[in-house]
Amino acid sequence: MTRPYIKRLSFTLLDSITDKDPMVQEQVCSALCSLGDAQPDETLHACEEYLRQHDKLAHPYRTKILRAMETVLSSHIHDLDKDTAGAVILLATSEMTRTKELDCDWQQAAGSVLVAVGKRFTNQVMEEVLSRFQPGMLPHSSVLHTLANLSVSNAFDMVPFLPSILSTMLPMLSMAKQDALKVVFCGALQHFSESILEYLANLDQAPDPTVRKDTFGADIFGAYDVLFHHWLQSRDAKLRLAVVAALGPMSHLLPSERLEEQLPKLLPAVLGLYKKHAEAFQISKSLGQILEAAVNVSSRTLEVQLDALLVALHAQICVPVESSSPLVMNSQKEVLRCFTVLACCSPDRLLAFLLPRLDTSNERLRVGTLQILRHIINSAAAQMEAKQPFILSSMRLPLLDTNDKVKRAVVQVISAMAHHGYLEQPGGEVMVEYIVQQCALPAEEPEKPGPDGEDLAADSVRAVSIRTLYLVSTTVDRMNSVLWPYLLEFLTPVRFTAALTPLCRSLVHLALKRQEAGADDFLIQYNANANLPSPFAMTTRLLVVSSNPYLGDGRGAASLRLLKVMHQNIHPFLGQRWETTMPMLLEYLDEHTEESLSLKEWEEKLLMFLRDTLAVVSDNIWICQLSQEMCKQLPSYSGTPQEKNFLYKCIGTTLGAASSKEVVRKHLRELLETARYQEEAEQEGLACCFGICAITHLEDTLAQLEDFVRSDVFRKSTGIFSIFKDRSEHEVERMKSCLILCYGHVAAQAPRELVLARVESDILRSMFQCFNTKVLGIKVETKDPALKLCLVQSLCMVSQAMCSSAQASSFHFLRKTELVTQMMEFIRAEPPDCLRTPIRKKAMLACTYLVNLEPALEEQTQADVVHSCLHSVMALPPEAEGGDGVGREPLYLDTVCALEDLLTRLLRQNMTPQGLQIMVEHLSPWIKSPRGHERARALGLGACLLEFFQEHLLVSTLVPFHNLGLLVGLFAPRCADTWTTTRQKAVGCVYSLLYLQLGYEGFSRDHRDDVAERLLTLQDGLVNADPTILFHTCHSIAQVIAKRLPSDQLISLLLTVFESLGDPDKNCSRAATVMINCLLKERGNVLLEKVPEIVSVLRAKLRDTQEEHVLPAAQHSVYLLASQHCEAVVSSLLGSPLPFDSHTCALWRALAVEPGLTAQVLELLLEKMSKDVPFKESRAFLLGSTADRVATLLPLAATCALYEVLSAPSSGTVVLELYPQLFAALLLRVSCTVGVQLPRNLQAKERRSTSPARAARNLDPCSSAVDALQALLLRSGSQDMLRCVELERGWELLKTSAGHEDGVAQLASSMAKYAGPRLPPVTKALACTQNSVYEIQRVTSTAFLAELLSSNVVNDLMLLEPLLDNLTARLKDSSASVRRLVLRGLANMASGSPDKVRAHGPQLLTAMVSGLDDGDEPHSPVALEAMVGLSRLLDLVEPWDLRLVLLHTTIRIRPFFDSEKVEFRTASIRLFGHLNKACHGDCEDVFLEQVVGGLVPLLLHLRDPQVPVASACKFALCMCVPHLECAELAAAFYKYLQEGRSVHFGEFLNSTCKHLMHHFPDLLGRLVSTNLFYFKSSWDDVRAAAPMFTGFLVLHAEPEQKTQVDLEQLIVALQLLLKDPVPGVREKAAETLGRLVKFA
């Protein structure tokens, strides 16, 4: 039976090979391979027979079948019997030669089959193939292909056939006329030759070791003759390439004399092909093989052909490369291989050809030549060794080339030279210097490649050079003597600066190696190496470049490491000390990045290191030599200002350590004479140098400065006609600026006790002498801002130095007023609209220091100082801050800090309330400014002054703070300023003033007042710009002020605040109103006396103005009126036009002020709302089938009014009393307005209304009712309930017909959770509406009551029984929606009262089962609700109660498994799972049959297109599996079917079927037949899963179980699925057919 069965399976699959979907075709082939794995002979026979019978089958499909056969053969060639092999060989040979097309996939597939068979049945294959390879007849091209492939795949078995094949083939060559066939012959000859060469190379393993090359020589030469003399001249490019590809391996098989004879013609011919073919890989490869063959026979022809060879090969290397594809790269490698061959046989001729070409200016030629040179240096090292000097000298011109590609090639050649000892020869240093030069190239961004794709950025050259230098210095030991100490020469020249990092790294490595070798090798003999930098030059250079440590790839750390290693060569005393200090510097760099490092701190650390080094050396001669070297290197850093600045500091430090005054004076004078004054950074550096030097040499420093000012150099520059002489006016100003800065730094750095005596007599005199210019005896004020800035900065340093002196308190500074006046002139001269220079800041700082010195400033002078400084900073535009407090310019912040310091220093002179008031009065115009940024700045300064005053307050006697009210009145209204920062600062000012009052009352400074501390908590409320919160906070602030303000200050406070009513900032005006009202209320009777007058005024304002403070008065009036005429007011307001405008809404809210009045208003509104019908039905068209519901006006107006009254916070008490009635009425109002429209007149009115007084709320009837219900919840304190419903979108659901029930349920759930005690009266109120004539109201009340049962709170409130009775009474309601909700409510007991379910089990189960049979509709929503409810209740009822309904329920829900509606599938399957879970005891026997019957549907519906259904199947399967009592199956289910985890369905199904067939083999037939039902499923994925399920069952079943399966029926069904419109289904069907081989 096996063969017919396999044949049928195979034929069924093969019939589907023509499927249009490629994936299905692939699956068919895969299934065929599966059949072949089990039954290779039968499958191959079936395929062979199918192809013979279906002669007309298109060749693409025949190809696929042949490919499948090849796969089977490759895997099972050793299992194949001879007959099958024979049949396959005949078929494949026939298929291979059926078409005469060349290079066809079909032929290739057939040939591959023959090659696969030929690995074992070589003789049989050769017999059949050679039968089609007859002498005198041109063979089929595929025959040649197959022979060639056989020879490559099985050389040992094929080579013995080759002599006869070659002898037969030779005559055929001349018969071939078609170029395509000639190409095939060439390929065959190439493979034959390669096969022979492989055989000869492995003779020790060959079956016949006697085979010799001579055996093939004659035939190969005969073939060579045809190929070379006839075919190579063809016009067909493909043929020419095929010929040359064959000639390469053939040349190794030619007899030596023949090869020697042919080389003069062969080599030129092959070289000529370069001109005809763009793709040169095959040509170069064959040329290399030919050259190797020629060398092997010691051919003399090469000498003759060498020049032509070199020219052609050189041209190939120099040809522009279009891409970096593997083919192009391989072609280059083959050409270089040719050069290697030539270098080994003719090195002199090769170099004589190459080296002159290095002198060319052509970039490509030079780069190509360098590539060849590098290659032969590496690959022919022995032959090139004697040529090293010659090669080195020829590199002279390439070293001068500026082209980046040439540079890169040169670097690579030098790298190769270094590895082979070239650089040890004379002239090798030049190569090293070249590498260093390339390391010093600028590290630019990579450039975009040019049009030819060849351009390399300079950085790539640099990167290659850096890597080369490091590798050569660290890995090539023979280079140590070349590089050390030679590389040290490159440290100090500026042109090598960019190479310092790689240089230092290499030098560190070399130095450490030398140290290991011994001190003699490491210590440098400077006398013998004149070009090496001295220890002083090296120290200076490495220290200075370390000042910017992250520049140049981190040269700071590299330089310091080199400095540390070189300590013995710098000074013998430094080693031990540097071992301690140097690692600390390096660790500091490691801890920081370029962004986090403070350059100022780093420079200070380096200067400290230098001081420490100088102290350790303690040798004046060495120090003087070091200072001389430092001065000598100054010009080298003209292009790097920061490093030059640091070098100046180093010079100052070194001179400070020198003990020779003559050397110090000499160097200082030279520095002054040679400085580049026009550079600002150099001015600063020179000044720092003089300052540092003055620490130990003050007299000498001042003397040198004085001498220079008097010298001809300076006088010559400052004469009236200097513009025509040596220096321009600009240069003169720069020189003056620098000298002034020098004096400032000298004063700042020198010892304080020495400076004070020299300030007026020397330092200031000289500074102003430089600053003031006289022309013809007349003083001319300078206009140079830089000179001004230097003077101000220096005066600041001088002033600070004077103040910090121990004798400052007794020092009488005569020029104080003059200097302050000068500073004010500078400040007033600054532009008022911008902040560009730090002149303001520096001048104010100078004044701050000067204020402390004697004599004291006059009062008017102080006022002028304050006024000028305030105007200079306050009036700046806000852009000066750089934005709203974020990213402010540091200059602005520093300037404000300087102003604060100056004002507090002036306040310190008069620490009295009067003094504080004077300072605040200066700020007052700015505090009241119409410009917000000016107010914010002024408040900031005010806060600073008050804080300072409070911190330094000393009250010796109890005195009144007489101006407290005035000051508080100035700051308090600013608590509502439109600027947030101003509000915050204003509160801080009030806070400080209240504590100042407490201080004056005698309280200690650390006393904390609870009332005043409230201001800090209120400060947070001012962050929010919401006016309600803002003014409420202002009210609270006013309460605090009222409690702490002395009575005698109240009038002044009120008068001051009343002035703020007209403040340009409207917020402050409103805040003034709030504060006035609060103060009046808190203080007593004033408000009561003024109420009538105030209310009258505000009511009049209501018509004319929209100011917010008017409205409360009008509301109060309405309240008084309603207290006397409640019903009239309510009726009148209800008659207002809808929608209510904002004034009407406000008046409604006023009626909620007093609880008694509020209760009356609410009861009246409830009566009005229920008095009329909620809607009327009308038809838009007389013939319309559906009537529109239109809201009635009175209930609508009452609903809107209820919302306004309930919105008033004061209505809360009354709302709690009337809560049940309000809640029930509003909920039912919501229900009966769902879908209800406005009357047409109101719709049009609402569309037309554009009045600003109109309320923003929507007039929609349902929305109005929902708003009122929300207001009720909010007012009753049920904010949590309100938020809960909002989060679940319950309010939106309430307004829609589709979501209304869910919205009601969410409302009930949240009430049970957050407002449980209110449920009994609410439940009672709603129960009374159960008989409402409106169905929607019955639905709403039932939904609410049903949801309550899901909460446990009904037990606590004794509501369970009443609710059950109420709901069960509605089971016969005429509305299906009501009945459905009743079932939902009964099921809710599972979550709300699970412990009560057992007691009510029969009642609940009866209700649910009756729900399953509700109505005649097959998909009744009541039945769906019953299934969902049963799922929830099953785990909680008595098992006996369940047993009574178990079977009926299971049978009733089974049809829903395959329902078209997803909800029914989900609910029924999940209920099935719960039935399994709840099944106990005897039920298991009854239920096991149902489990087995449901297994297939559940597994297949895991592929259901709906996720909930698949999830339900996971649950049901996990519940079913225990009944099967199979641990392995249970483990698989729990592993794969975890909730939330995606199921790899194929893997899971495979595992499941494996366990099912192992433990339940008798179920095979039943499972397969059930699967057959789903072969016709309407869901594609389920339809695809069914055959897959079947396939896995078959895969894991034992062969003897096949009797359970109707194979005929199954195969027919699968055949039908192979015609399914869905490719995935066809694919699975094909896969399953492949598995049916199991039952063969």
UniProtKB/Swiss-Prot annotation:
Report the GO terms under cellular component. Answer: lysosomal membrane
Annotated compartments = Lysosome membrane
Q: Which Pfam families match?
A: HEAT_Maestro (PF21047), HEAT_Maestro_2 (PF23210), HEAT_MROH2B_1st (PF23221), HEAT_MROH2B_C (PF23227)
User: What is this protein's function per UniProt?
Assistant: Lysosome fission factor. Recruited to lysosomes by RAB7 (RAB7A or RAB7B) at scission sites and homooligomerizes to mediate the constriction and scission of lysosomal tubules. May sever membranes by inserting amphipathic helices into one bilayer leaflet. Lysosome fission is required to maintain their steady-state number, shape, size, composition and function, and to accomplish regeneration.
Q: Which GO terms describe its biological process?
A: lysosome fission
Main localization (coarse) = membrane
In the record, the note on similarity to other proteins reads: Belongs to the MROH1 family.
Q: What taxonomic ancestry is recorded?
A: Eukaryota, Metazoa, Chordata, Craniata, Vertebrata
Q: What is this protein called?
A: Maestro heat-like repeat-containing protein family member 1
Q: How does it assemble?
A: Homooligomer; homooligomerizes at lysosome scission sites.
The family database entries (InterPro entries) matched by this protein are listed as: ARM-like, ARM-type_fold, HEAT_Maestro, HEAT_MROH2B-like, HEAT_type_2, Maestro-like_HEAT, Maestro_heat-like_prot, MROH2B-like_N_HEAT
**What gene is it encoded by?**
Mroh1
Q: Which UniProt keywords apply?
A: Lysosome, Membrane, Repeat
Q: Which molecular function GO terms apply here?
A: membrane destabilizing activity
Repeat HEAT: residue ranges?
3-41, 218-256, 344-382, 385-423, 575-616, 1357-1395, 1398-1436, 1604-1640
Organism's domain of life? Eukaryota
